[in-house]
Amino acid sequence: MMKTLKKYSPKILLFLMLGIIAASCTERIDVELDDTYTRLVVDGQLTGDSTETHTIILTESTSYFYNQPPPPVTNANVSVKGDDGSSILLSEQDPGVYLLPEGFKSKIGVNYSLDIDLEKEIDGHIKYTASSSTPSIGDTVYIGLQYQPDWGEKGYYVVQCYYWDPLGPNWYMFDIYKNDTLLTDTISEKQVVDDTFYDGGFTNGIGVGYLDQSRKDQVLKPGDVISFRASSITEGYANFVWEVQDEVSFSTPLFSGPPANVVGNLSDGAIGYFTSYSVLFASMVFE
């Protein structure tokens, strides 16, 4: 009896261990996240493009697992004032969406302040403020394309920028368009760079956008018009975009911290950012 037991006991122990491991791997663990207090969320950009619709969007923050559009903040008094003496009271176009007049564009060198007066207080506050300067930008920018056949499944086209950078620290954000359709329509897709490597010099075709030829919306055909908008932004807004991109990018759960709200420039604990920037455009026809 003892001999038989000794012969098979390792296999029995192995099956028992595998069973325990399998059971532990399939165990359901429910994670409970406490809801925090509600805060005001602000999204507002003023640009030097008079053809753009300029809005200030106000919403309320929601819990981590909230799977619906955030509640809009309605019936607020929202105004934008410039230190050049300009003052604009915005109209509410849609719930939570406050519109600047058609044809508005921000002016280089002007500092703009945003004033928000809520109908009902949020997080104990009814008034919120923010401000932003409007950085200058050069006079001319040019666009180029370079094909990289070894990148990805079907290659990439690199959108290149040729530009004389003004002397001194500058920060730029780039949006890419194909036939007037914005391809970089989320903050995670925008290219934001500083001028560390070309301060006061020529950019000589730096990559500011990447078109994946295995993606239907990015495939280039003869006659397509490729454009970019170069925006001269503040250092604060550049850091904000970089931090948002870090938060939404892939990370290893075991070694990364929990998601957190990115610090903006609004007063009294509000989330988001209000900014103003100048812009240049460049376009080319793909052949």
Where are these regions (language model features)?
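Bacterial N-terminal signal peptides that target proteins for export
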Residues: K3-L13
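C-terminal motif of bacterial Sec signal peptides marking the signal peptidase cleavage site
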Residues: I21-S24
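A sequence/structural signal for flexible, mid-protein segments enriched
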Residues: T26-E287
